[in-house]
Amino acid sequence: MVNDPPVPALLWAQEVGHVLAGRARRLMLQFGVLFCTILLLLWVSVFLYGSFYYSYMPTVSHLSPVHFYYRTDCDSSTASLCSFPVANVSLTKSGRDRVLMYGQPYRVTLELELPESPVNQDLGMFLVTVSCYTRGGRIISTSSRSVMLHYRSQLLQMLDTLVFSSLLLFGFAEQKQLLEVELYSDYRENSYVPTTGAIIEVHSKRVQMYGAYLRIHAHFTGLRYLLYNFPMTCAFVGVASNFTFLSVIALFSYMQWVWGAVWPRHRFSLQVNIRQRDNSGHGAQRRISRHQPGQASTQQSDVTEDGESPEDPSGTEGQLSEEEKPEKQPLNGEGEQEPEASDGSWEDAALLTEASTSALAPETLGSLRQRQTCSSS
């Protein structure tokens, strides 16, 4: 029993352990709440930047296949077609979302795959026309461009065939040319008359082609240029800006909720006290004004009753002062109670004192004059 530690030391150790455990739990809880708050703010920042990018950035490039059709109800003995090849291309996604954005400049081109056949080489120049239309099929813009195959001499064609003969035999290469026709260099969408489709027509009945594609590429300037060419840098700056802004809002909200010292409420309480003081002052004036007619009537009754005045020879000046004392005591009592109703402010007490003195002065002089006239009579 001699080696046992003293009881106060055990109690002190237990108290210290409880305090440290409480602090540790509190710190863990605070760090957990802080970590969850940071994750939430970061997720909201990423979501806001993604929403802005999706709504602000248009489609960079749109490629649509062009399927030409022509009439076949004519004499088929000739090598030419019955009509010019025509194609109708829709400029909407899934029939709802439009490809073009308002105010954004676009470069519209038509890519033609033409074989190097003798017919196309003898064809020369031909015309390609595009007509953009809006709802209801109304044409809003038309553009025409001339096209022809690139010239290649017979010697150059023979050398090209010999060099790429193995690739041509196994189908890895073809004797064709890809022509890119620029239909619009700076096409802008009208917000009031949106473009819903385009009609493409090739003005040649003898043209031979493998396929065609309509390509729409956006030309970015300003902020869109930065977002498109530097996506990672802009994403980091945008998310960091959103996170900083949201963090400041959360910090001010926490300070207002916990401390309540950022925007003190003394101004509001001061306004309330001023209003209460004004209301109490008006009430005191109304009570004094109600009390004045009663004093005048009592004084007149003292003078006219039995034709005797308060200054009768049987009376003394001490009696006069004693008659005035009951009249002053209620007013002094009221003046002492009014400051208590106005939250104990000395301004209300001064106001009521001035009002009481101004109200008593005329009555005292009038009563003295009446007493003098009665005594002289």
From Swiss-Prot:
Ranges that cross the membrane: 28-48, 243-263
Topological region Cytoplasmic: 1-27, 264-377
Cellular compartments annotated: Endoplasmic reticulum membrane; Lipid droplet
Pfam families: Seipin
Any one cellular-component term (Gene Ontology): endoplasmic reticulum membrane
Residues glycosylated per entry: 88, 242
GO biological process: adipose tissue development; central nervous system development; chromosome organization; cytosolic lipolysis; determination of adult lifespan; fat cell differentiation; gene expression; hair follicle development
Domain of life per record: Eukaryota
Residues modified as Phosphoserine: 289, 342, 345
Subunit structure, as described in the record: Undecamer (an oligomer having eleven subunits). Oligomerization is important for its function in lipid droplet formation. Interacts with LDAF1 to form an oligomeric complex. Interacts with RAB18. Interacts with ZFYVE1 in a RAB18-dependent manner.
Name by which UniProt lists this protein: Seipin
